[in-house]
């Protein structure tokens, strides 16, 4: 359950930061949320790989591991929602749809 705890804490912080950025209309804080989402996605992928290995090693664990995977997927999705809030904050502040901008393009937009 270490992955669930780690990702859960990260996502909780992301959601809090996204809502704070929205409240303050702070695009820089929103950018940090978007950056954190990439880490959540990476951690989610690593956790899935670890769980695949565990299922291959011990078939009796498949049911409980699948439950963990569903929890992790839900947490990852919450992180995506926090990222969507952050994108809306930037849109409200700059009037630009940033959903498909690269990290470099987004940094340039907020710098200028």
Language-model features: locations:
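Cytosolic, long alpha-helical scaffolding segments
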Residues: 1-112
């Amino acid at each position: 359950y270490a992955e669930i705890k780690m990702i859960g804490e990260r996502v909780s912080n992301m959601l809090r930061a996204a809502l704070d950025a929205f409240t303050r209309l702070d695009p820089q804080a929103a950018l940090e949320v978007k950056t954190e989402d990439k880490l959540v996605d990476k951690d989610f992928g690593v956790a899935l790989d670890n769980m695949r290995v565990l299922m291959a090693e011990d078939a009796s664990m498949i049911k409980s591991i699948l439950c963990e995977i569903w929890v992790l997927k839900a947490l990852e999705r919450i992180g995506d929602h926090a990222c969507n809030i952050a994108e809306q904050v930037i849109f409200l502040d700059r009037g630009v749809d940033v959903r498909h901008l690269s990290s470099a393009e987004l940094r340039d937009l907020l710098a200028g």
